[in-house]
Amino acid sequence: MTLVNEHFLKLPGSYLFSDIAKKVNTFKITHPKQDIIRLGIGDVTQPLPKACIEAMHKAVEELASKDTFRGYGPEQGYDFLIEAIIKNDFIPRGIHFSASEIFVSDGAKSDTGNIGDILRHDNSVGVTDPIYPVYIDSNVMCGRAGVLEEETGKWSNVTYMPCTSENNFIPEIPDKRIDIVYLCYPNNPTGTTLTKPELKKWVDYALANDTLILFDAAYEAYIQDENVPHSIYEIKGAKKCAIEFRSFSKTAGFTGVRCGYTVVPKELTAATLEGDRIPLNRLWNAASAPSSTVLLTLPNGLQKPFTVQKAKYRLKKQSTII
């Protein structure tokens, strides 16, 4: 008899963003003349830059020729993209990685969901509240979240760290040890950020408590303040306690293309029950996306188009949200 993973049965009957989409569609039907400002899924509204489209056409033509056809890509992603990521995203900020610490994938969402597969099911979990649903759902599906408390809508084995107007939407450092802490900055859904001193407190906490920080930096492209770090690795010691997730959805408008990457430093370890330290880098892998070739164009003359594109989003935001 084949048995199901009964933890899946604990999930609520519907997904938050699916519910939002249904309500939006219903509203559009009943109010056809209303202009809707969507504050749900962080989708893009501008087309892909011309250079990306040209690169896509070139990549397709390569697949059509016997001389240039590519099959399965390298398990960590193509070297040309990994080298470009290191050169453009990290070296300018004084951060240095080897190519084997960067894992190209089909997006930050899948990686933040799948990363739990290399961690024991009985690790304790901490999340900011409110939180991106994937962080919770992925822990529910592996049995790490515990039992859903109907009255509160919260899970028994998850520590929720409130982000409210009372604390300026900045969570307080926990007063107890937690095995895994999810941080997303700039934050989804509040839009808040952490300064370097504020993020340093979390790194210090993680180092002192042997805590793993899962840092979602999907929205780093929108940071404008010099005192707000684009990467957790701008903080000393973070390579020993943090995994960082990046997305090209906001940098390159790739929500419909799917490509991102995860950084797993070689210095980062976790323990076995016997107390042996195991490098997490060697446990992780990547799903090399076909969109990788397109991203080679990003560092080559595309800074201006992407700067203009981000400026359009900011102007749109300022003109429609009061």
Residue ranges and their predicted role:
Residues 2-106, 308:
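N-terminal small-domain helix-loop-helix segment of the aminotransferase-like
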